[in-house]
Regions:
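Structural motif
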Residues: 11, 60-63, 262
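C-terminal motif of bacterial Sec signal peptides marking the signal peptidase cleavage site
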Residues: 15-18
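Structured, acidic catalytic/metal-binding patches in enzyme active sites
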Residues: 29-247
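A cross-kingdom marker for long, charged
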Residues: 238-302
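Sec-dependent signal peptide recognition
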Residues: 2-10
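Active-site-proximal flexible loops/turns
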Residues: 9, 54, 282
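Alpha-helical scaffolding within the catalytic cores
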Residues: 26-31, 256-258
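Bacterial signal peptide processing site
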Residues: 20-22
Length: 302
C-alpha cells in the first residue's frame, strides 16, 4: 500500500472527542531557541490540531508562555470561527471552479460517494467542493471516531491562555493561505489520496490516526520523522508531490523560521505554536535556524 495515505492524515490534522475521567497528560515537542547576543528567546511548541477534553499540558509550557510578550500561531482559529463572512469567503477557495465534484473525480466519483454515504459523511453540499475538501471531511470523521476533537487542539488551548492574559496574537498565515495550499494541490494527487484512503480498511486508517496522536503526545521524534521519510511517492506523480510538499511544509517552515529569526534579532521573547510536523519535515523550522541561534529541546518527565 502506498504510504502516501498518511499525507491525508498529517495534512488535515496538522492543518485544519473524547472524554475520560483520567487526565490525558501529553509531552509534545518543545524547543527553546535563543540568541545570546540580543537575549532574544523563542519557544517553539509542536502542536496537534485535535485533542481530547481531558488533555493536560506540562506546567513548563504555560510557564514559558507566561514569559513571552506574544503568541504566534498559524492562524487565530477562534477569531476565524467568530467571523462567519470571512470563513465563508475562505471556503469558496475550495469550491470546484468548473463543474462539480463528480466532474472532478470522474470515474472514481460513484465509489467515493458510496463510501461517504456508508459512513454517514455524504452531503449534497460536498458536490460543490474539490477532493481536498472531501479528504478533510474524512479526516474529521476519523478524528471523531478515534475520540479526538478540534475543540481540544493545542493551538486552541494556547490561544485561550494567551487571550486570558492579554497577550499579543500573531498570525503567521491566514485561512485563505491555508485553504489555497489545498486548492493548489494537483488534482491527480488529490484524487489519488482520497481514492487510496477510501479503499483502505477503515480500522487501519483509525490506527494511523491514533499512531500520529501517540507519537506527538509522547514526543516520539523517530516515529514523527518516519511518517515523512517513509512516504512512497505515487508513480507518475513525483513532480506533483514535490510541489505539494514544498507548499505544505518547506515553504511554510522557512516563513515560520524567518519570524523566529526576526524576533531573536530584536531581542524579543515569543512563543510559537505550530503543527508538530513543521518541526520534523525536512528542511524543518529548526534546520532553517541552525547556526543562527542556540537550540535546546525541552524534555518532560512522566
Amino acid at each position: 500500500m502506498k504510504k502516501i495515505l498518511s499525507l491525508l492524515l498529517i495534512g488535515a490534522v496538522m492543518l485544519f472527542s473524547g472524554c475520560a475521567a483520567r487526565e490525558n497528560k501529553v509531552r509534545p515537542p518543545f524547543f527553546k531557541i535563543t540568541d545570546p547576543d540580543t537575549g532574544g528567546t523563542a519557544y517553539l511548541l509542536g502542536t496537534m490540531h485535535v485533542g481530547k477534553a481531558n488533555t493536560v499540558y506540562p506546567d513548563e509550557i504555560y510557564a514559558a508562555l507566561g514569559e513571552c510578550s506574544a503568541l504566534a500561531v498559524e492562524l487565530d482559529l477562534q477569531a476565524l470561527e467568530a467571523d462567519q463572512p470571512r470563513l465563508n469567503n475562505a471556503m469558496k477557495i475550495l469550491e470546484c471552479k468548473n463543474g462539480s465534484a463528480s466532474d472532478f473525480l470522474g470515474g472514481d466519483y460513484d465509489e467515493i460517494r458510496t463510501f461517504f454515504q456508508n459512513k454517514q459523511l455524504y452531503s449534497p453540499n460536498l458536490d460543490a467542493y474539490i477532493p481536498a475538501m472531501w479528504s478533510s471531511a474524512l479526516s474529521n470523521k476519523l478524528a471523531g471516531d478515534c475520540g479526538y476533537s478540534s475543540m481540544y487542539g493545542t493551538d486552541r488551548a494556547m490561544l485561550t491562555y494567551a487571550k486570558k492574559h492579554s497577550m499579543k496574537i500573531v498570525e503567521l498565515e491566514s485561512a485563505e493561505e491555508q485553504y489555497q495550499i489545498n486548492a493548489n494541490e494537483p488534482s491527480e494527487l488529490q484524487i489519488y489520496s482520497l481514492r487510496s484512503s477510501i479503499q483502505t480498511d477503515y480500522e487501519i486508517l483509525k490506527g494511523q490516526m491514533k499512531e500520529l496522536y501517540r507519537a506527538w503526545s509522547e514526543n516520539d521524534s523517530a516515529a514523527l520523522e518516519s511518517m515523512i521519510a517513509e512516504e512512497e511517492i505515487p508513480e507518475g506523480l513525483e513532480e506533483e508531490y514535490a510541489q505539494y510538499y514544498y507548499d505544505m511544509y518547506e515553504g511554510r517552515q522557512e516563513k515560520m523560521a524567518a519570524y523566529i529569526a526576526e524576533a531573536l534579532k530584536n531581542g524579543d521573547k515569543v512563543f510559537v505554536a505550530v503543527g508538530a510536523m513543521h518541526c520534523y519535515a525536512p528542511p524543518d523550522i529548526l534546520d532553517f535556524l541552525e547556526g543562527k541561534a542556540v537550540i535546546e529541546e525541552i524534555k518532560f518527565g512522566n
